[in-house]
């Protein structure tokens, strides 16, 4: 899913940020849920079964792997094309851990 579509549909989607805590703290999509990739198995119960999950990382590589795994497990899952780098380049907002303007690291 491209950044513009994800931004437009943000309220109906479950945005899952799979990056490391320091990356998430530096900048994330407001309202996204942070579950680092390595914790996903233990925290799978936190994922919705009634909404499309859009997986997010910096470039789309890690989130692409998570997207494939979730789809194989029966979830409606899509990858954010180009990750947060493309999201930010499209001019969409990012928030840091303190609630200020975020950045992609």
Task: Walk through the language-model features, giving the residues of each.
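Short, surface-exposed ligand- or partner-binding patches at beta-edge/loop junctions that are enriched
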Residues: 56
């Amino acid at each position: 899913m491209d950044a513009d579509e994800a931004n437009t549909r943000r309220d109906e989607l479950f945005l899952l940020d799979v990056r490391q805590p320091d990356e998430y703290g530096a900048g994330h999509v407001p309202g996204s849920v942070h579950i680092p990739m390595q914790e996903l198995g233990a925290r799978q119960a936190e994922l919705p079964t009634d909404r499309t999950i859009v997986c997010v990382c910096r470039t789309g590589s890690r989130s692409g792997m998570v997207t494939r795994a979730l789809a194989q497990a029966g979830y409606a899952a899509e990858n954010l094309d180009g990750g947060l780098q493309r999201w930010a380049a499209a001019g969409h907002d990012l928030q840091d851990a303190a609630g200020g303007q975020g950045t992609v690291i």
